[in-house]
Amino acid sequence: MLRSAPLALGLEPHPLNNSLAFPVFYHIHCYCPSPLLLSLLLHYTVLFSPFGARNHKLYIYIYIYIYIYIYMCINVCTYMNAGPRGVCSLCVYVCTHFNIYIHTYIYLLFVY
């Protein structure tokens, strides 16, 4: 009962040292988002951002980064025989770092 309590609270083992970490940026099953979904998200931020189209180079870099991430995430999960929604530690690690970057980017975009 007590051993399952952290999981009930939303805590997961950290992929590197197996300690519990609060998954603020973790996917539940390490989803690999589709390019269409991410493209729609970025087009939305371009259309409604306070910066407008002035920083179009920034958006191009973000696009490139996202597609590299998708390629890496799908290949890693397939290589680990976990499938695109598998819970392999390396895939979770990649997804976690991507989530930190994209959430930070969106936060900075709408705050500054």
From Swiss-Prot:
Highest taxon of the lineage: Eukaryota
Any one GO CC term of the record: membrane
Keywords: Membrane, Transmembrane, Transmembrane helix
The keyword Kinase appears for this protein: no
Transmembrane segments: 33-53, 58-78, 91-111
Cystine residue pairs: none
Membrane topology of this protein: Multi-pass membrane protein
Main location: membrane
Compartments reported by the entry: Membrane
Miscellaneous comment: Completely overlaps YIL100W.
Protein name: Putative uncharacterized protein YIL100C-A
Organism: Saccharomyces cerevisiae (strain ATCC 204508 / S288c)
